[in-house]
Amino acid sequence: MKKNLWILFIFFATYNISFADNLKIVDGDTIILNGEKIRFSGIDAPELKQTCIQNDKKVKCGVSAKILLVKKIGNNIPKCISEGKDVYKRTLAECFVNEESLSKFLVRSGYAFAYRKYSKKFIKDEEFAKNNKIGMWSMTFEYPWTFRGN
């Protein structure tokens, strides 16, 4: 069983997950939709290589964020509202599945953070996850921007 879970983790960590010809899930806050790289605006999810500590064990929290997004999207194609481009020329957007914000879902689930440097929109959702020790808030972690060094 542990071997199968390890294989699944490696699969999710190393491949862009594609459910349709026009959707690939890159990580917890980035998708490619119709060939366009979209970074979810206002949030920051852990990097794929990022780990957290829970009960003295390393947890692949970056992979967990991606898996959570994969499960949430399911076989749906997100609808995204563009907010412009970032310095890396990615489209910044808020994306929805069944009229639910994927950004809000990830932050309330504790696997993304309100990216206060750029937006205040998801602060209450982050406070909800933090106060209820949901997701990464139940672990010891580094914020993604600290992990990346920026």
Residue positions per predicted region:
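Small beta-barrel nucleic-acid-binding modules, primarily SNase/OB-fold domains
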Residues: 2-6, 11-150
